[in-house]
């Protein structure tokens, strides 16, 4: 029996556009991609990250000087998958504006704060959460030690990324990420994860 939630999530709305050659149908995400809007929606994993990276590279090739808007609603996920999106955001020429819609937790919060300085936004009721990467590898003692060392390296790297984009001192970042740390939009702004809280497009436009 199909889960009705899964069925709903797999239903992607279609939009019809009138062109000189007649009507053309797009799925809603492809239509928004034409407007240079990229969605980071749901858990961050390899499949999702490769789609986001491909969209960013496509938009850069299309126009390297025009801003890209990234909408984020994510509980986080695989660290390396999130870092592939992060690195691409820093690598491409277009400025990337970020906006959290709903939640930006774990790697979602890192992608949110990685947007262009002054162009990182939150809707008023969004939630943001930061924490350290989790381990949990099982196996031989030596392998467990190797994976523990790798987790520590990732933790140190993520700390440095948050320091870079928030302007917070390293000790404050380390302390904040020690446990799940939930913030509302105002707290995220005070912490430097975002630049502005927007309630309407008019507010967003005046913030730029």
From Swiss-Prot:
The active site is at residues 106, 131. GO terms for biological process: protein quality control for misfolded or incompletely synthesized proteins. Keywords: Cytoplasm, Hydrolase, Protease, Serine protease. It catalyses: Hydrolysis of proteins to small peptides in the presence of ATP and magnesium. alpha-casein is the usual test substrate. In the absence of ATP, only oligopeptides shorter than five residues are hydrolyzed (such as succinyl-Leu-Tyr-|-NHMec, and Leu-Tyr-Leu-|-Tyr-Trp, in which cleavage of the -Tyr-|-Leu- and -Tyr-|-Trp bonds also occurs). GO terms for molecular function: ATP-dependent peptidase activity; ATPase binding; serine-type endopeptidase activity. It comes from the Bacteria. Its EC number is 3.4.21.92. It is an enzyme of class 3 (hydrolase). One of its GO terms (cellular component) is cytoplasm. Pfam families: CLP_protease. It is found in: Cytoplasm. Belongs to the peptidase S14 family. Cleaves peptides in various proteins in a process that requires ATP hydrolysis. Has a chymotrypsin-like activity. Plays a major role in the degradation of misfolded proteins. NCBIfam families: PRK00277.1, PRK12553.1. Fourteen ClpP subunits assemble into 2 heptameric rings which stack back to back to give a disk-like structure with a central cavity, resembling the structure of eukaryotic proteasomes. This is ATP-dependent Clp protease proteolytic subunit. It comes from Dinoroseobacter shibae (strain DSM 16493 / NCIMB 14021 / DFL 12).
């Amino acid at each position: 029996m199909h889960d009705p939630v899964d069925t709903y999530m797999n239903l992607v709305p279609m939009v019809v556009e009138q062109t000189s050659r007649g009507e053309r149908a797009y799925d809603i995400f492809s239509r928004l991609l034409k407007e240079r809007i990229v969605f980071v929606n749901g858990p961050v994993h390899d499949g999702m990250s490769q789609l986001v990276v491909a969209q960013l590279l496509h938009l850069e090739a299309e126009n390297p000087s025009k801003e890209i808007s990234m909408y984020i609603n994510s509980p986080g996920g695989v660290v390396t998958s999130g870092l592939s999106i992060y690195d691409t955001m820093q690598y491409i020429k277009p400025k990337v504006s970020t906006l959290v819609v709903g939640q930006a937790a774990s790697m979602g919060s890192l992608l949110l704060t990685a947007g262009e300085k002054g162009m990182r936004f939150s809707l008023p009721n969004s939630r943001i959460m930061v924490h350290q990467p989790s381990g949990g590898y099982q196996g031989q003692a030596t392998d467990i030690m190797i994976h523990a060392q790798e987790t520590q390296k990732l933790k140190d790297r993520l700390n440095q990324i948050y320091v870079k984009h928030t302007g917070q001192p390293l000790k404050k970042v380390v302390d904040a990420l020690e446990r799940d740390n939930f913030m509302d939009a105002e707290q995220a702004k005070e912490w430097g994860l975002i630049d502005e809280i927007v309630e309407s497009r008019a507010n967003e436009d005046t913030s730029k």
